[in-house]
């Protein structure tokens, strides 16, 4: 099989099984570095690879899983020597069978900041060294596997995309509760890895076929039907007596049968599996075609532990923005990060689902500050972030350190803006907000704004950004100054939803600027926009009236099934009118009591 045929197979292909399992059976001593055997005993390693290829593995992983500077510290061999020998051994073994050789890459063995001490860019540099050595040695593809930290996987994927041209398979290990050891969800993994350029996503290790299946099903549902998905389960669970794993090759093959319904790109085994396990999978997946029926992809924004599916109205907190706020501007100039973090925490507590982040203020270094604020925010909140800036460098620095899949606010219809912002969003897997404005300014007519939105949408699609990640802002104009254009915004929003199939966003509070009792206008305009199809409402989540409108709307449109969220939020609250009546009724009684006491 040629590399360019990898994702064009008409049948689910087989991966290999456990390397450590085979080496332990061959007498590998506890604490020894398996990767050094690439040089000290190449015949042993080559023989294991050949057994897997003979069993039907079309992709065989080189013995390079632990080849990192940290894990090889003190070795007599360099990282490059071990990787080169590992790739060459695997290629020799695979050649007679037409199997491909994968550079197998695992976690570095050090925790990244903020959980550990390894800086993100140092991790990227370490992975760059690994993948460049693998490509130079002749690897056909890169196989990142057994990751539990999404941030480390991001570092690995960036290194591979920036330094090689090899196809990339990316896999994480999930526990029985459906999250990795660090709390990452299946959906956050899928959205982030796909966005960063992985060519296939999968699940390996930790559990057996039966336990992994529900998570594999979620993974398949979280990516397009034609996007490759794979699995490499363990041979069940380790036996208590340390004598191996509790699933036989025959039972493993039987438990893998339900995976046929997922139409996987590939399947194999991990810890405890051997060539016999892989050989039996030939029958399990005989005639199984990869690829699932097309389905409408949700728009997902995420951090590792919090996956927000934008399906209907979603609240974006607007308060992390210094515009018109002297205290906020002062905090940014003084580096008062606590003030910024307080805004994040209070909005999260009020019910925001996403946080807008704008740090553009006079007298600050916006790119440096954006990076610092993104890192700081992700240390105190799990909510996804909307990076809000017109400064390309600030967006680039924020996107690079962000852990998960963010949204960028914004670009517009100007060609130079599109050319600057869209490639950034593509590289870092971010969703994009497009303002329906161009070099000619804001158009008063809805049709003209839709025309600009169409150009933005076409440019984003051409840049490789999926339609579900395109958001159009039809621009909220102030009712005090441009009252006649208010309805045009709502009309344009509705047309963008129907004609372009994109998501929509509005800065709701702009509508009331300069007018009294702003909450009345904001809430009414929000309701109009929701009815027209608004997806992201950039607003103040501390506004009880606006949040009530959102929750009530979700009940009345059947999005909040059984009114579960509405009841949870409002069951214990007393309406303002009732509270006033109760206070008025209590007042005379209180006065009478005071009189009696005197």
Predicted regions and their residues:
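Domain-level signal for soluble alpha/beta catalytic cores
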Residues: 1-473, 477-598
């Amino acid at each position: 099989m040629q590399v360019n045929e990898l994702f064009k197979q008409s049948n689910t292909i087989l991966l290999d099984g456990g390397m450590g399992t085979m080496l332990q059976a061959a007498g590998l001593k506890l604490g020894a570095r398996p990767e050094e055997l690439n040089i000290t005993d190449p015949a042993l390693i080559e023989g294991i690879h050949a057994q897997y290829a003979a069993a039907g593995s079309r992709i065989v992983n080189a013995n390079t899983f632990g080849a990192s500077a940290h894990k090889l510290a003190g070795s007599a061999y360099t990282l490059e020597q071990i990787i080169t020998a590992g790739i060459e051994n695997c290629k020799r073994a695979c050649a007679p069978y037409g199997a491909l050789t994968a550079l197998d890459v695992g976690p570095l063995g050090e925790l990244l900041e903020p959980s550990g001490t390894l800086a993100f860019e140092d991790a990227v540099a370490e992975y760059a060294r690994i993948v460049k050595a693998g490509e130079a040695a002749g690897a056909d593809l890169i196989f990142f596997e057994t990751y539990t930290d999404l941030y480390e996987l991001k570092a690995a994927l960036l290194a591979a995309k920036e330094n090689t041209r090899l196809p990339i398979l990316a896999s994480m290990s999930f526990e029985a509760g459906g999250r990795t050891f660090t709390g990452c969800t299946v959906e956050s993994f899928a959205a982030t890895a796909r966005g960063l350029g992985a060519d296939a996503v999968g699940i390996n290790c930790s559990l057996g076929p039966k336990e992994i299946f529900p998570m594999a099903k979620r993974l398949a549902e979280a990516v397009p039907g034609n996007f490759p998905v794979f699995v490499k389960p363990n041979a069940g669970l380790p036996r208590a007596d340390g004598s191996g794993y509790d699933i036989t090759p025959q039972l493993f093959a039987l438990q893998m049968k339900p995976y046929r319904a997922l139409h996987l790109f590939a399947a194999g085994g991990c810890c405890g599996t051997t060539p016999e396990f892989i050989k039996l999978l030939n029958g399990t997946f005989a005639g199984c075609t990869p690829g699932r029926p097309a389905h409408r992809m949700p728009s997902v924004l995420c951090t590792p532990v919090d996956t927000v599916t934008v399906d209907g109205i979603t609240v974006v907190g607007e308060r992390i923005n210094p515009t018109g706020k002297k205290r906020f501007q002062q905090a940014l100039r003084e580096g008062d990060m606590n003030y910024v973090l307080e805004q994040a925490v209070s909005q999260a507590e009020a019910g925001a689902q996403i946080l807008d982040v704008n740090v553009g203020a006079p007298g600050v270094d916006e790119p440096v500050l954006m990076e610092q604020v993104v890192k700081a925010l992700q240390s105190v909140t799990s909510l996804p972030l909307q990076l809000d800036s017109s400064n390309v460098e600030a967006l680039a620095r924020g996107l690079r350190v962000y852990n998960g899949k963010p949204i960028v606010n914004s670009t517009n219809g100007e060609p130079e803006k599109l050319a600057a912002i869209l490639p950034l969003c593509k590289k870092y897997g971010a969703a994009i907000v497009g303002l329906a404005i161009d070099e000619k300014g804001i158009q008063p007519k809805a049709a003209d704004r839709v025309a600009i939105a169409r150009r933005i949408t076409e440019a984003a699609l051409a840049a490789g950004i999926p339609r579900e990640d395109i958001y159009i802002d039809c621009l909220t104009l102030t009712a005090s100054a441009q009252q006649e254009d208010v309805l045009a915004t709502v009309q344009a929003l509705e047309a963008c939803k129907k004609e372009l199939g994109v998501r929509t966003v509005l800065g709701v509070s702009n509508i009331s600027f300069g007018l009294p009792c702003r909450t009345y206008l904001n809430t009414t305009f929000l309701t109009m926009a929701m009815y027209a199809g608004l997806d992201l409402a950039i607003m103040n989540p501390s506004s009880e009236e606006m949040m009530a409108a959102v929750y009530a709307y979700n009940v009345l449109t059947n999005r909040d099934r059984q009114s579960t969220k509405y009841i949870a939020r409002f069951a214990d609250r007393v309406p303002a009118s009732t509270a006033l009546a109760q206070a008025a009724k209590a007042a005379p009684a209180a006065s009478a009591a005071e009189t009696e006491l005197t």
